[in-house]
Amino acid sequence: MILSFTSCKQITRQVQSPVTIGTIEYQGYGATLDAQSVMSMINLAAAYESMTLSDTVYTKVEGKIKEVCSKKGCWMTLDMGSGNDIMVRFKDYSFFMPLDAEGAVIVSGKAFVSETSVDDLKHYAEDAGATQAAIEAIVSPKKTYTFEAVGVLLAI
C-alpha cells in the first residue's frame, strides 16, 4: 500500500530488505531499484546546465547526501560538486528518508530545473533548522536543480 501526502506532516517509510551490490550494502526506500545504468554526478551536472524549465531527464544517479529534512525526512539535497546542490523530493510523498541519513545514495526518477518559490525556500530553511533571521532574509525565488525520486538506495 502506498500513502500519498502533500506536506511533511506524516511519516511513511517504504523500506525494503538490505541488498548488496558489489561490495556495498544498500537499504532501499520507495520503488525497488538496481544499480544498473547509473549516471555519474558529473554527467548529470552537465545535463542540468543545458536544461530549461520545461526539460526533464529520467535517470538514476549516484551521489552524496548533503542534507536531509530534519523534521520528517521528506526531502534531501545531494552535492553536485560544483557549488550547486540537487533538491531531491519523493514522488507523491510516498516515502521518506531516515532523519540521520548520510553518505552515498543512488536515486531513480526524473531530473528537471524548477524555480523554487520564496514560501518553499522559507519552508525548507525552517525544516533545516535555519535561524529566523536567515529565513526572513529569503526574499526572491531561486532556480533549483530538482530531482523527483521514485526510489532510493542508501549505502549502509
Task: Identify the residue ranges that each predicted region occupies.
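OB-fold and OB-like single-stranded nucleic-acid-recognition modules
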Residues: 8-156
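C-terminal motif of bacterial Sec signal peptides marking the signal peptidase cleavage site
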Residues: 3-7
